[in-house]
From Swiss-Prot:
UniProt short sequence motif Histidine box-1, positions renumbered to this chain: 137-141
Name of the encoding gene: erg31
Predominant cellular place of this UniProt entry's protein: endoplasmic reticulum
Subcellular location: Endoplasmic reticulum membrane
Location of the Fatty acid hydroxylase domain: 123-248
Motif (Histidine box-2): 150-154
Listed pathway(s): Steroid metabolism; ergosterol biosynthesis
Superkingdom: Eukaryota
Notes concerning its domains: The histidine box domains may contain the active site and/or be involved in metal ion binding.
Pfam families: FA_hydroxylase
Gene Ontology, cellular component aspect: endoplasmic reticulum; endoplasmic reticulum membrane; Golgi apparatus; membrane
Job of this protein: The third module or late pathway involves the ergosterol synthesis itself through consecutive reactions that mainly occur in the endoplasmic reticulum (ER) membrane. Firstly, the squalene synthase erg9 catalyzes the condensation of 2 farnesyl pyrophosphate moieties to form squalene, which is the precursor of all steroids.
Name of the featured protein: Delta(7)-sterol 5(6)-desaturase erg31
Length: 300
């Protein structure tokens, strides 16, 4: 993060602070303010850019005809994300500050730990994050925690890419915590850290994009995560299915999801919706969602 902050200082922030309220670059108040806005606007840029590209070119828009797609859902997803990104940025600032002040194992040169470790650190990051997110996500589904923190994200049953960041600030922060913890336990190249931070944002969008290409037994793809949103209590992992398998929470995607015609079959949908309603009622009780199908019926 120091690379990004230095560039921002050099090309924009020095001039802004000098004009508004002069503070030295190493002033912790200035650093905190700068990191907050960089994280907020950077996160917003990544979210709106990647989610919009995915929505335009990848997302299967026939899913918007699903009976559990919500009225004004895309607008609500974007609004929810934009309302909560500042809070997520605020919660993230202390971690970036700690990294900036040398409390992490972030390093500058690949030669510091060697090429072999550098290459090994990439899958290590993925597995560490996947393990941490699995347990954070499972914690968020605890019956006392779910209605207070995570229920908002499960408002979206049939997701669009914009649902990827549409959750409460504390929810998003808890699920991102393993990313920030990693460099405090293991050495990680600084530029790689920034690249991985971008990658995890992209991955979050990808597993919400509704493009059910692969039923890979190892990789947690969009179909697996769709199963999580429909059936609630399965597939908590982010990148792989490993920890769901070990934690007995893995559920293979429904085969019908990989066949566009079969996916829209009334009999297939009836079975899917019966199970969805049973699980949703157990997890949430009364349903306060306004589905587009119900709205259309009211208008006729």
């Amino acid at each position: 993060m120091d690379y990004l902050l230095n560039y921002a200082d050099q090309y924009a922030l020095d001039s802004i602070y000098n004009a508004v309220y002069p503070l030295a670059r190493d002033n912790i108040v200035r650093q905190s303010i700068s990191l907050f806005f960089l994280t907020w606007f950077g996160g917003m840029f990544l979210y709106l850019t990647f989610a919009s590209l995915s929505y335009q070119f990848v997302f299967d828009k026939s899913l918007m005809d699903h009976p559990k797609f919500l009225k004004n859902q895309v607008f609500m997803e974007v609004l929810t994300a934009l309302q909560n990104l500042p809070g997520m940025a605020l919660l993230t600032v202390p971690w970036f500050l700690a990294e900036l002040h040398g409390y992490s194992y972030l390093y500058d040169n690949i030669s510091d730990y060697g090429l072999k470790y550098f290459l090994c650190s990439l899958p290590l990051f993925v597995m560490f994050s996947d393990f941490g997110i699995y347990w954070a996500h499972r914690f968020l589904h605890h019956r006392y925690v779910y209605p207070r923190l995570h229920k908002l994200h499960h408002k979206w049953i049939i997701c669009t890419p914009y649902a990827s960041h549409a959750f409460k600030s504390a929810d998003g922060f808890l699920q991102s915590l393993p990313y920030h913890l990693f460099p405090f336990f293991f050495p990680l190249h600084k530029l790689t850290y920034l690249a991985l931070f971008t990658f995890v944002n992209f991955w979050s969008i990808m597993i919400h994009d509704g493009k059910y290409i692969s039923n890979n037994p190892i990789i947690n793809g969009a179909a697996h995560h769709n199963g999580h949103h429909i059936y609630f209590n399965y597939n908590y992992g982010q990148f792989t299915t490993l920890f769901d398998r070990l934690g007995n929470s893995f559920r293979a995607p429904d085969e019908a999801w990989f066949d566009k015609d079969l996916r829209q079959n009334e009999d297939v949908l009836r079975v899917e919706l019966m199970e969805y309603e049973a699980i949703r009622n157990e997890v949430e009780g009364d349903d306060d969602r306004e589905y587009i199908a119900n709205s259309a019926k009211k208008n006729h």
